[in-house]
């Protein structure tokens, strides 16, 4: 489903603006409409973060840009609590925007993409706080192009270790 939405977003919104869509996540912003937080790169190699409203008119899917920022203006991404599995995060521009991703995995996918594009295009000191750095940095053994599967894989690894440890007899 998400690949179809991504194709539709690219075709109807980003390609006409001569931008490449790198990542999008669904965010909880309104009860009536769906919203996406998108990361794109322009032909001039400017990284943009865009909030898009998705709605339907009849059978036609429509997308409307509601907010647009430059990655250059982003000061910090705050994941709220690194130790808990929650979808909440803040984007710190001149103003702080508190957002809720559809899932914790999509929050991490967004932060990973922003971090990767920052290193590729801006190389500025972008603060990414209250995230587990193992899942954010590409130099980690857990980094992957599977994005949302990354967090699930790590959780399964820890669960397997716990099962193995619980089955080991304790010496008396």
Swiss-Prot record:
Lineage: superkingdom: Eukaryota
Listed InterPro entries: Sec3-PIP2_bind
CDD domains reported in the protein's UniProt record: PH-EXOC1_like
Protein name as annotated: Exocyst complex component 1-like
Underlying gene: EXOC1L
